[in-house]
Amino acid sequence: MATLEAIKYDGEKLLVLDQIKLPLETHYDEVLSIQDGWDAIREMRVRGAPAIAIVAALTIAVVMKRSTFATAAELAAFVRTSLEHLRTSRPTAVNLFEMAGRLEALLQEQPADCTEAALRQAVLSYIEGMMQADIADNQAIGKFGAEAILKDLSADVKVKVLTHCNTGSLATARYGTALGVIRSLHEQQRLEHAFCTETRPYNQGARLTAYELVTEGIPGTLVADSMVSLLMKQKGISAVVVGADRVVANGDTANKIGTYQIAIAAKHHGVPFFVAAPLTSVDLKLSHGSEITIEERPGKELTHIFGQQLAAPGIGTWNPAFDVTPADLITGIITERGVAYKAEGQQEFDMASFAASVGRA
């Protein structure tokens, strides 16, 4: 069965699947302006660090194609202003900032006599190449992740894997990161069962990951976030694999709220805990997880579901969207260039050395 598409782009039109309405309704919103793209990201109609970056970039592309600029300088100013605004949509996912930095570097590299047409083509080529690159990267992550989980097992053993939040086709251009690893295991007929958490308070696991598993015929079971420790104790979980919104130089990883407690439970039960993310999610400018800006979401997302209030009126809320899992709880970090592991006896990763060793640009 074909994988789901969170982003549809045909070179002229950009459609974004409204993931807030899933799984009850499948509806695509057309992005016509920079503000439309910002709203889709901020309101979490599109989410997942890779998808956020792609939608932001394609937003610039479609608006640029419908606009005219007298000079290359005028076009460059439009791109820079658009990036400045789009950066403010979600602060934790590093892919958006990585994309913006690379696009700004591309603008800076153009010769002084660059024409508007030449600059337009350079910007569009970079942006439109992002989707295909993301799909290829995700498939490589799936391959390397499956190998890492299976490497010490005999060929006839099937695995049970737990994941958190949504990291599949709905969070990327296609295929997925952590869910891509599960897909790869399933394609190899080495997956016995996938378990996904509901992922409160936004229920990305219940609404989105469960939807992807059912749609694609992958054997799966939904569990409440509070069931994870008992699940590991009683159901024989082989590995945990989660995504990442930002991995810093020592391997500390920001991911959807609830990831940290799953990592603690995995450590206690001796379950390998893997992070799956493209190298664009690795932020070598930050040394430790304490430096990551953690987005806080409106309290209504915690007290209401589909507009219906569940919590007692007047109760206070604290609603961080992410937490940081320390490197010492992480078994390996799966990327499109291979799996990063800690040196023997070390509690932290050396992501700079790993990135250099695999030729990260």
Curated annotation (Swiss-Prot):
- Asked if the keyword Isomerase belongs to this entry, the reply reads yes
List site positions: Transition state stabilizer: C165
Name where it's found.
Cytoplasm; Nucleus
List the EC numbers from the record.
Answer: 5.3.1.23
Q: Which InterPro entries match?
A: IF-2B-related, IF-M1Pi, IF_2B-like_C, Initiation_fac_2B_a/b/d, M1Pi_N, NagB/RpiA_transferase-like
Annotated pathway: Amino-acid biosynthesis; L-methionine biosynthesis via salvage pathway; L-methionine from S-methyl-5-thio-alpha-D-ribose 1-phosphate: step 1/6
**Keywords carried by this UniProt record:** Amino-acid biosynthesis, Cytoplasm, Isomerase, Methionine biosynthesis, Nucleus
GO cellular component terms, semicolon-separated: cytoplasm; nucleus
- Report the superkingdom from the record: Eukaryota
**Which reaction does this enzyme catalyse, per its entry?**
5-(methylsulfanyl)-alpha-D-ribose 1-phosphate = 5-(methylsulfanyl)-D-ribulose 1-phosphate
Q: List the disulfide bonds.
A: none
SUPFAM superfamilies from the entry?
NagB/RpiA/CoA transferase-like (SSF100950)
Q: Which GO terms describe its biological process?
A: L-methionine salvage from methylthioadenosine
Molecular function in Gene Ontology: S-methyl-5-thioribose-1-phosphate isomerase activity
Main EC class the enzyme belongs to = isomerase
The protein's matches in Pfam families, at most eight in alphabetical order, are given as:
IF-2B
The entry's family comment says: Belongs to the eIF-2B alpha/beta/delta subunits family. MtnA subfamily.
NCBIfam families in the record: eIF-2B_rel, PRK05720.1, salvage_mtnA
**Function text:** Catalyzes the interconversion of methylthioribose-1-phosphate (MTR-1-P) into methylthioribulose-1-phosphate (MTRu-1-P).
Q: Which HAMAP family match?
A: Salvage_MtnA
Q: What is this protein called?
A: Methylthioribose-1-phosphate isomerase
**Native organism:** Monosiga brevicollis (Choanoflagellate)
Taxonomic classification: Eukaryota, Choanoflagellata, Craspedida, Salpingoecidae, Monosiga
